[in-house]
């Protein structure tokens, strides 16, 4: 049997957008990461001013957009090539489930929602449903 997490599988009628597999940093001009993945922390915390646009790291389809007790306002993108990315603690989302987005498109805005202490974008990356470190994809950050 196939096991999926609710909200992470394309629904009937949704068209998958396949990403390039080449990622861009989701918060341009903000390079400071206060915390990388490790010790129970699942992503990179990119410090930025409240309301700063958050960009899709690659093209794909929005598979989740909503509220989570820990993530606050968040968006998840399926890039259709085994990769998924998740962006959390947004002040607001700019997309909805089922939307097809292009690399560099605004998907939301930096905030401080959910289990958060200060404005930042929490950024997670997955390959074949396994969590991977953004530090390996962006070694110069």
Task: Please report, for each region that a protein language model flagged, where it lies by residue.
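Non-catalytic extracellular/periplasmic "stalk"
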Residues: 1-20
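Catalytic cores of peptidoglycan-degrading enzymes
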Residues: 19-141
